[in-house]
UniProtKB/Swiss-Prot annotation:
Catalyzes the reversible phosphorylation of UMP to UDP. Homohexamer. This is Uridylate kinase. It comes from Lactobacillus delbrueckii subsp. bulgaricus (strain ATCC 11842 / DSM 20081 / BCRC 10696 / JCM 1002 / NBRC 13953 / NCIMB 11778 / NCTC 12712 / WDCM 00102 / Lb 14). It is found in: Cytoplasm. The lineage of its organism: Bacteria, Bacillati, Bacillota, Bacilli, Lactobacillales.
Amino acid sequence: MSQVKYNRIILKISGEALAGEKGTGIDPTVIKKLAHEIKLVHDMGVQIGVVCGGGNMWRGETGAKLGMERAQADYMGMLATIMNGLALQDGLETAGVQTRLQTSISMRQVAEPYIRRVAISHMEKNRVVIFGGGTGNPYFSTDTTAALRAAEINADVILMAKNGVDGVYTADPNLDPSAKKFAELTQLDMISKGLQVMDRTASSLSMDTHIPLIVFNVNTPGNIKRVVEGENIGTIIRGDK
């Protein structure tokens, strides 16, 4: 059996990653592949919580820029994350992985309400728990949700699964060929250098709770498993100052 470095994880998946090459909506082929990747880690006995973004369907900031009330636009974004969570739940259960979707906004016909102790109990029973609906409050990103849930469930690490990005760079490597990838950073480094890995609220919370982040390319098969085993891929952001 493979050696596991992280026993309980939060996996943060961007909405764009679920859209595949289309860029918007949900690609069933991507869901199937991602479910397979998560199953590899699940079968190693790792306890898994998943936070999905909603950017493949809607962004609250975009709605606000178009004239919508920001809070209303953010609630729409929260609903988008729940739709993504339902799609991923279906993919995982089709792959044979018991899964529970918990939402911060009550919708009992489709998901459980988020309750911290229940979520931990599910994980201890080897069920994957998907956290939908963000924090349940406007103005907070799903990155902040990932940092918050990681703290609440005592996760060992937050895995920032990026769509085609294999780590944190000094600049956008697509625009600057001389950009260098960081092997390791601290949360304070990330904030002081203005690196756009996650928003400042999420970064500050992760720094306060000392939970490390690993930024890696989720599109490479086997990468989630490699990270959990401790292989040095991507960029690790230490949970200290």
